[in-house]
């Protein structure tokens, strides 16, 4: 029986009866068999019993929590059953050794930029991002690498106006909170991407708090931020372009006031459905010679990083080939 991601988009209570979880809300009680749950995303006020937490811990199921704005709040991260002291030491070594960290940081930006270029090529948009990317060669500090990444993404966001209809104009990137519809979609999607990467990292032996491009910090899984950069263009952004251009998401799917713009319940449900559909979409892997889902690609990326820090094979960031 294949497992899948579950998304709780309304207020409710998670209860346990034997080995079945029930989500109870104003619409009734819905059974969620534990052997079908891969991970869970919870939006809104969710009450969870200790019995549910115990079962999720036993089965190794992470739960990701998001706030009113759709921002990631935190995760229930089950006790790690795949701990590796050797890997932890190697991960830390590649952060502490500046030359090793700088190399990985540049590779994450290179992978993200090349996927951005693939997206822009799909929409036949000429750009100067490739020229900006060459500046990585001269970058000798992590802050300089981050600066290159920031300028690439800023230029990339300018081209959103060429892909999307006028009512979804970017007008600059705004985050907390987003001030217009396109910024709302980007923030919502990026939060989902971050949580998806956390899930995949949980299923490897990698420590999610040791990162290379982003600074390791308290209260965040910074390695998930590193890996998210590679997949945001080909998962989150493509979902946004599809939903908006197909008019599956319109102005009616947002709550707007003077201070912020947020997806309403209907808009969130539409986005989540398409995002999950994208994660489950399979493509034929040119190296493996078989079909893999986008969700699996994230896990494979983590495995590649693991091989790199062990010195088994140089890390080569994933770049879409279509």
Curated annotation (Swiss-Prot):
The entry's keywords: Antiviral defense, DNA-binding, Endonuclease, Hydrolase, Magnesium, Manganese, Metal-binding, Nuclease
InterPro entries reported in the protein's UniProt record: CRISPR-assoc_Cas1, CRISPR-assoc_Cas1_C, CRISPR-assoc_Cas1_HMARI/TNEAP, CRISPR-assoc_Cas1_N
UniProt-listed GO biological process terms: defense response to virus; maintenance of CRISPR repeat elements
Superkingdom: Archaea
Positions with a binding annotation for Mn(2+): 149, 214, 229
Pfam families: Cas_Cas1
Record bears the keyword Transferase: no
GO molecular function, one term: metal ion binding
Signal peptide positions (record): none
Cofactor: Mg(2+); Mn(2+)
Subunit description: Homodimer, forms a heterotetramer with a Cas2 homodimer.
HAMAP family with a match to the protein in the record: Cas1
Function recorded in the entry: CRISPR (clustered regularly interspaced short palindromic repeat), is an adaptive immune system that provides protection against mobile genetic elements (viruses, transposable elements and conjugative plasmids). CRISPR clusters contain spacers, sequences complementary to antecedent mobile elements, and target invading nucleic acids. CRISPR clusters are transcribed and processed into CRISPR RNA (crRNA). Acts as a dsDNA endonuclease. Involved in the integration of spacer DNA into the CRISPR cassette.
Membership in a protein family: Belongs to the CRISPR-associated endonuclease Cas1 family.
Name this polypeptide is given: CRISPR-associated protein Cas1 1
Organism: Methanobrevibacter ruminantium (strain ATCC 35063 / DSM 1093 / JCM 13430 / OCM 146 / M1)
Lineage summary: Archaea, Methanobacteriati, Methanobacteriota, Methanomada group, Methanobacteria
Gene: cas1-1
């Amino acid at each position: 029986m294949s497992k899948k991601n579950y998304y709780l988009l309304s207020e409710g209570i998670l209860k346990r009866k034997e080995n079945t979880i029930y989500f109870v809300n104003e619409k009734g009680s819905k059974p969620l068999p534990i052997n079908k749950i891969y991970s869970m995303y919870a939006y809104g006020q969710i009450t969870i019993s200790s019995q549910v937490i115990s079962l999720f811990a036993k089965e190794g199921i992470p739960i990701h929590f998001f706030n009113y704005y759709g921002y990631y709040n935190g995760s229930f991260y089950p006790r790690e059953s795949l701990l590796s002291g050797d890997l932890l030491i190697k991960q830390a070594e590649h952060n502490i050794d500046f030359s090793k960290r700088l190399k990985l940081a540049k590779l994450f930006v290179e992978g993200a930029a090349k996927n951005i270029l693939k997206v822009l090529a799909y929409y036949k948009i000429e750009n100067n991002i490739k020229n900006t990317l060459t500046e990585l060669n001269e970058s000798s500090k992590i802050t300089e690498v981050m600066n290159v990444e920031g300028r690439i993404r800023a230029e990339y966001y300018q081209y959103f106006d060429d892909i999307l209809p006028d009512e979804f104009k970017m007008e600059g990137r705004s985050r907390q909170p987003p001030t217009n519809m396109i910024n709302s979609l980007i923030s919502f999607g990026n939060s989902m991407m971050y949580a998806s990467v956390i899930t995949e990292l949980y299923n490897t032996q990698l420590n999610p708090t040791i990162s290379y491009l982003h600074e390791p910090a308290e209260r965040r899984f910074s390695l998930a931020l590193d890996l998210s950069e590679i997949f945001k263009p080909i998962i989150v952004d493509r979902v946004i372009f599809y939903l908006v251009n197909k008019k599956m998401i319109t102005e009616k799917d947002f709550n707007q006031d003077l201070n912020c713009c947020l997806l309403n319940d209907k808009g969130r449900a539409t986005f989540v459905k398409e995002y999950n559909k994208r994660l489950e979409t399979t493509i034929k892997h040119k190296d493996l010679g078989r079909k893999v889902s986008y969700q699996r690609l994230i896990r494979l990326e983590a495995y590649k990083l693991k091989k790199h820090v062990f010195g088994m094979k140089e890390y080569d960031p994933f770049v879409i080939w279509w």
